[in-house]
């Protein structure tokens, strides 16, 4: 089933990409209205939008999905129900396709809720307590966004149709559209894990690694960004951009700091995803929706490759995800190491790789835009942090001595895993330049002073050096993380966000429930209710029973008592 799914997904991916580029060249969009049924002149119509953006995005989703499924052929080979796993992944892709081609909030909700439900099934795929808790956190965080979309559907009843794309320029000044835009922003923030909904993304790493490669690169987490790209005209009309800009920059900064003090390989990559999502959100808020979409596509390519390399390393190290157990992997797994380093350099924005064409352009546009120094600082400092944790990953996993069992051997022998990685390596190297030529027929012309032009490269170099400084291990054990323990605890736990969004949110209702149970259900409620009534009736019945059992004694005692009274009355 893996090979069949790979073949069809790859075929559709190629077809959609060619069609998308053709639609882009001739500037063509297609609306398809499918009438499901008609009742007394009321038609139930399903609408699809087929334009270059939806076609190119679907082709990328299907290309990555095809390689992920092929990769799963080896990664999940010990799984008894691998066909079930593939079916769930295909349901995930179908939900994403619904979301991409829908200009209608009802059909968007089908894809949106489908993504949430299937992602829950995939996060809890390994049956243990950790996976279950992570799945619940993922599902409940995303339910907030689902509720926001449901409320926006209710608000759109005032317009007579749920096709939001028709109302951009006609009722853009209405109060209802303002509320709907706010609700869509809330939904996008939950799905794309922006502050304060960020804690579910690292927790979702409990899913199998092929799922992480698909979900956290091109599908689930980018759904919110894609929805905001579609709603971009509304963001510009109501001037909500400043809010998204601030949240996006804070998310980028927080996740960059957190990744520098994390030791779980998959969580580091998840935090890097969070950082790039913040970058997409922030540049989208300035009105550059095409740039955000461009970075979304390039990021999907190299992030899927990064997860695949991480999966290959974890698979060979018998499911160990701690980077402190790794070391000198470059000698044992050269292909994985090459792919891992190329994708890390793409993430940093190293020149002429896929990430460079989008990330460097975004940073140059920021230099050109009217942003204050705080936002400017957050952008470039977060870029430096990206280089820092990328170099730290290389330092811990690739270089140095092997820290795993001395008698343990591992290699790149798996054909399926290697094929999946090479398929993504090619597009991670050449995809950025190809897309920049195709998506921007007239290239962006950014004229800046030389020091601003070189600022990005300088930031990457300084960030790499900082990554070396904080991870360098000397014999005196003077580690940065031990010298600044409080700071490391704060940043390494995502500014205590998992505690705030789980423990503190649930503490009040859970403690209220506990004391209610103790005081009412198990206390006064029992005393005055079931148990109390039971005890009272048992006592009453026992008392009455004792009276019945003592009838003769009572009669005799009463007779003696009355005889005594009569004696007293007559003889005294």
Curated annotation (Swiss-Prot):
Q: Does the keyword Transport apply?
A: yes
Cited PANTHER family: NADH-UBIQUINONE OXIDOREDUCTASE CHAIN 5
UniProt GO molecular function: NADH dehydrogenase (ubiquinone) activity
Q: Which organism is it from?
A: Locusta migratoria
Q: Which spans are transmembrane here?
A: 6-26, 44-64, 86-106, 107-127, 147-167, 179-201, 208-230, 234-254, 268-288, 291-311, 337-357, 372-394, 422-442, 454-474, 479-499, 524-544, 552-572
Q: How does it sit in the membrane?
A: Multi-pass membrane protein
A GO CC term attached to the entry: mitochondrial inner membrane
Please name the InterPro entries in this protein's record.
NADH_DH_su5_C, ND/Mrp_TM, NU5C-like, Proton_antipo_N
Enzyme Commission number: 7.1.1.2
Known role:
Core subunit of the mitochondrial membrane respiratory chain NADH dehydrogenase (Complex I) that is believed to belong to the minimal assembly required for catalysis. Complex I functions in the transfer of electrons from NADH to the respiratory chain. The immediate electron acceptor for the enzyme is believed to be ubiquinone.
Tell whether rRNA-binding is among the UniProt keywords: no
Its keywords, alphabetically, are: Electron transport, Membrane, Mitochondrion, Mitochondrion inner membrane, NAD, Respiratory chain, Translocase, Transmembrane, Transmembrane helix, Transport, Ubiquinone
Subcellular location per the Swiss-Prot or TrEMBL entry:
Mitochondrion inner membrane
Q: Name one GO biological process term.
A: electron transport coupled proton transport
What is the designated name of this protein? NADH-ubiquinone oxidoreductase chain 5
